[in-house]
Regions:
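Conserved, mostly hydrophobic/aromatic
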Residues: 190, 210, 227, 262, ...
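Conserved SAM/AdoMet-binding glycine-rich loop
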Residues: 106-108, 117, 219-341, 352
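Aromatic/acidic polysaccharide-binding cleft in carbohydrate-active enzymes
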Residues: 361-377
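Short glycine-enriched, charge-decorated loop/helix-capping segments at active-site entrances
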Residues: 78-79, 199-200, 239-242, 301-307, ...
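Proteins enriched for Cys/Gly/acidic motifs involved in redox and nucleic-acid/cofactor modification
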Residues: 1-235, 273, 288, 310-321, ...
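Generic beta-strand/beta-sheet core signal
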Residues: 37, 109, 195, 228-230, ...
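Short flexible coil/turn linkers enriched for glycine and charged/polar residues
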Residues: 173-176, 186-188, 284, 294, ...
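Terminal RNA-binding accessory module
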Residues: 2-3, 374-466
Length: 466
C-alpha cells in the first residue's frame, strides 16, 4: 500500500466544476449532443456513465451514434495492445466525419492516455483531437471542455492517479442495476499488467459513503449493484479505521438491495471471512470471478501472483464447500514469456480440475513498462494462437458439463432486455452469473423473474417462466 494518503476531491472543487458546467450551458457554440465510446472493463463502463452524466448536465443530449454527435469522447483501455489499436482506429475514422461536420469535437481519455507520453503522442499524430485527459482527471471534464471551447489548440491534462472523487453526476445505462466503485488502483504489480501504472496505487472509499450510495440506489428502485475495484478483496487497508471487504459486504447486505455482485478479486486476498459472509448472506449472489491466469507454479511466480496452484485450488474448494452451487469464472493467459508446452498443459489440467462455468481467455500482450515485457523467450505468435485454441476447446467441454447441473433447477433472472436471437425471448443473468433466456415481453425488462432451467447451449441457459 502506498504511504501517501489519497487526495479526496473537495466539495469546493466539485462546485467549481459545476460552475464550469453552467458556463458551458450558456455558450451558443457548445456541442448539443454527445456520444461516449467505451473500451475495457466495468470500471471504464462506470467512468463513462459519470462522463455522460456531466455531459448531460452541460445541456447535451446523448446521440445514437458517433456520426450524429457534436462531441465524441473515447474512454480507452490499454490492458492489451488490441484495445489500443481499436480505439486509435476509431479515432482516425472520425477525421473523415469531421470533414462533413467541422464543429465536431473529439476527446480521448482513460487508461491509454494515462501512460507516460501517450497524450502528447496522440495529439501530435491526431491533430484533429480537441482534448485528452487521464484517469485522474475525469472529474475535471467540465473545466477541460470549457478550455477546449475557448481555445484554438488542444487541451491536455494528465495528473498522477491518487485522487478519489465522489458525488459526481451519473447517467446510468440501466435503471434496474448500478455500479458502485468501492476502491481504485492496484498494489499487486503482476508482471504482465499495466493497471497499477495507469490506475495508480490502491485507495479505498470510506465505507459510510459507499453504504449511503447503496441506500440512495435502493430508494431509486435499483435491484442489483455491482461493487467495483481492481482488487476488491484488498478493500479498506488504507482507511483510517480499517474495514475488511467482508465487513463492507455484510453492511451492504443489510441495506436490502435484492442482488449484490462484485469484481475483480485476487486469489491471494480471498479470506475465509469473506467466504463465510457470502455463505450466510441474503443478497450477495452465489457467483465468484476468481482469475487464476495460469496453472503452472513457475509461471505464476514469474507473473508475481503471490499464490501457487495448490493454494488457488484450496480457495476453490473452500468456496464450493461453503456455497455448493456457486458459479465460478476466471481469467487465463496463454503465451506468457517462457511458457513451455508442459507448463501450458498444466493450465489445461487446472481448467479440467476446476470446471469453470465460464472463462475469459487471452493471448499474452506485452505492455511497455511492465516486468514481463522485458523477459526473454517471448512465445511466438503462432504457438500462442495454437495454445489458445486448445484452451478454448477444453473450456468449452468443461463449460458444457458445468452448465448441465442447472437443468431442472430454478433461477431468479434479472431481465435486461430482449434476446439478440429472438424477439419473443427475453434475456438476463441468473443468481449464478449465467445468461438465461426465456419467453417474455417488454414488461419483464428490469424485473426479477423466476424461471425453471430446461436447457443449456454454449454459454447460455434456457428457461420457462414459473
Amino acid at each position: 500500500m502506498s504511504d501517501r494518503k489519497p487526495v479526496i476531491i473537495s466539495e469546493e472543487q466539485l462546485e467549481e466544476q459545476r460552475q464550469y458546467i453552467q458556463q458551458i450551458r450558456l455558450m451558443p457554440d457548445a456541442p448539443k449532443s454527445y456520444h461516449v465510446v467505451t473500451y475495457g472493463c466495468q470500471m471504464n463502463a462506470h467512468d463513462s456513465e459519470i462522463l455522460a452524466g456531466m455531459l448531460r448536465d452541460m445541456g447535451m443530449e446523448e446521440a445514437a451514434d458517433r456520426e450524429s454527435a457534436d462531441f465524441v469522447l473515447f474512454n480507452t483501455c490499454c490492458v492489451r495492445d488490441n484495445a489500443e489499436r481499436r480505439a486509435l482506429g476509431n479515432v482516425t475514422w472520425l477525421k473523415e466525419v469531421r470533414k462533413k461536420n467541422p464543429r465536431l469535437m473529439i476527446g480521448v481519455c482513460g487508461c491509454m492516455i494515462q501512460q507516460p507520453g501517450m497524450a502528447e503522442k496522440i495529439l501530435k499524430q491526431y491533430r484533429f483531437v480537441d482534448l485528452a485527459f487521464g484517469t485522474a482527471n475525469l472529474y475535471c471534464l467540465p473545466e477541460l471542455m470549457l478550455k477546449a471551447l475557448e481555445s484554438d489548440h488542444a487541451v491536455v491534462e494528465v495528473e498522477e492517479q491518487n485522487t478519489i472523487a465522489e458525488g459526481l453526476p451519473v447517467q446510468r445505462l440501466r435503471h434496474d442495476a448500478a455500479y458502485i466503485t468501492i476502491m481504485y488502483g492496484c498494489d499487486n504489480y503482476c508482471t504482465y499488467c499495466i493497471v497499477p501504472y495507469v490506475r495508480g496505487r490502491e485507495r479505498s472509499r470510506a465505507s459510510a459513503r459507499i453504504i449511503e450510495e447503496a441506500r440512495e440506489l435502493k430508494a431509486d428502485g435499483v435491484k442489483e449493484i455491482m461493487l467495483l475495484g481492481q482488487n476488491v478483496n484488498s478493500y479498506g487497508k488504507g482507511l483510517q479505521t480499517p474495514v475488511t471487504f467482508a465487513q463492507l459486504l455484510k453492511a451492504l447486505d443489510d441495506v436490502g438491495i435484492p442482488r449484490i455482485r462484485f469484481m475483480t478479486s485476487h486469489p491471494k486476498d480471498l479470506s475465509d471471512e469473506l467466504i463465510d459472509v457470502m455463505a450466510h448472506s441474503k443478497h450477495i449472489l452465489p457467483q465468484f470471478h476468481l482469475p487464476v491466469q495460469h496453472g503452472n507454479d513457475e509461471i505464476l511466480r514469474r507473473m508475481n501472483r503471490h499464490y501457487n496452484r495448490a493454494q488457488y485450488l484450496d480457495r476453490v474448494r473452500k468456496l464450493r464447500e461453503a456455497i455448493p452451487a456457486i458459479g465460478l469464472t476466471t481469467d487465463i493467459i496463454v503465451g506468457f514469456p517462457g511458457e513451455t508446452e508442459e507448463q501450458f498443459q498444466d493450465t489445461l489440467s487446472l481448467v479440467r480440475e476446476v470446471g469453470y462455468d465460464s472463462a475469459f481467455t487471452f493471448i499474452y500482450s506485452p505492455r511497455t513498462g511492465t516486468g514481463a515485457a522485458k523477459m526473454p523467450n517471448q512465445v511466438p505468435e503462432d504457438v500462442s494462437s495454437r495454445r489458445i485454441q486448445e484452451l478454448l476447446k477444453v473450456q468449452e467441454e468443461c463449460q458444457k458439463k458445468a452448465l448441465k447441473r442447472f437443468i431442472g433447477t430454478e433461477e431468479e433472472v434479472l431481465v435486461e432486455g430482449f434476446s439478440r436471437r429472438s424477439d419473443t425471448d427475453v434475456s438476463g443473468h441468473g443468481l449464478h452469473g449465467l445468461s438465461v433466456t426465456f419467453p417474455g415481453t417488454e414488461s419483464d425488462v428490469g424485473e426479477i423473474v423466476r424461471v425453471k432451467i430446461v436447457g443449456a447451449k454454449n454459454n447460455t441457459l434456457t428457461g420457462e417462466r414459473i
